[in-house]
């Protein structure tokens, strides 16, 4: 596998709709950076958030997940309580080629503040807005800025196409828009 450079990402985004909307240059002035970088793409977080709450003394069960475990927030800023967790999604919609696997890393600006981002790999032929898991590991409230960078995606191209893609498996998160909660 090879990591793909900026010119390949640009070509795939503008010519094949791999990333929409696509920001062709990295935006940095007064914001947490987003857009095309040398070997990746810094995605923006949208203005919709689901923040974990324990109002009903719920237990988190991935096989029987209750949406009541979250409080919905929409706006330009999200405050994640200390030692808590939120779900969000990217502004961008991704369409991953059959011979590409995409991995995600958090932004150093947030990581240096104790805010950790997790996203599972984007599999070949998956498409949708990416649901982002954001953990505030600090004992203080943490501010997340909608419309600004939240994570960086790295595109790894295989030497050949995979035998079975996410689309072939009819994956349960195919075509998702907005925040997707766990599904069985």
Curated annotation (Swiss-Prot):
The enzyme's E.C. designation: 3.5.4.13
Keyword flag Hydrolase: yes
Residues given in the record as dCTP binding sites: 107-112, 152, 166, 176
Pathway listed: Pyrimidine metabolism; dUMP biosynthesis; dUMP from dCTP (dUTP route): step 1/2
Domain of life of the source: Bacteria
Catalytic residues, chain numbering: 133
GO molecular function, one term: dCTP deaminase activity
Keyword tags: Hydrolase, Nucleotide metabolism, Nucleotide-binding
Cross-referenced Pfam families: DCD
UniProt cross-references to InterPro entries, sorted A to Z: dCTP_deaminase, dUTPase-like_sf, dUTPase_trimeric
Top class in the EC scheme: hydrolase
Family: Belongs to the dCTP deaminase family.
Record's subunit section: Homotrimer.
Name under which the protein is recorded: dCTP deaminase
Organism: Granulibacter bethesdensis (strain ATCC BAA-1260 / CGDNIH1)
Gene from which the chain derives: dcd
């Amino acid at each position: 596998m090879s990591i793909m450079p900026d010119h390949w990402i640009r070509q795939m985004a503008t010519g094949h709709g791999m990333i929409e909307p696509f920001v062709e240059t990295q935006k940095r002035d007064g914001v947490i950076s987003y857009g095309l970088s040398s070997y990746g793409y810094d995605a923006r977080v949208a203005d919709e958030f689901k923040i974990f709450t324990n109002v009903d003394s719920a237990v988190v069960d991935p096989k029987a997940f209750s949406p009541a475990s979250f409080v919905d927030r929409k706006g330009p800023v999200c405050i994640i309580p200390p030692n808590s967790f939120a779900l969000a999604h990217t502004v961008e919609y991704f369409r991953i080629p059959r011979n590409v696997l995409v991995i995600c890393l958090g932004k150093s600006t947030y990581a240096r503040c104790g805010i950790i981002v997790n996203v599972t790999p984007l599999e070949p032929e998956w498409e949708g807005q990416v649901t982002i898991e954001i953990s505030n590991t600090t004992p203080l409230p943490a501010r997340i800025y909608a419309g600004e960078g939240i994570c960086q995606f790295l595109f790894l191209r295989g030497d050949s196409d995979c035998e079975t893609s996410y689309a072939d498996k009819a994956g349960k998160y195919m075509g998702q828009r907005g925040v997707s909660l766990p599904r069985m």
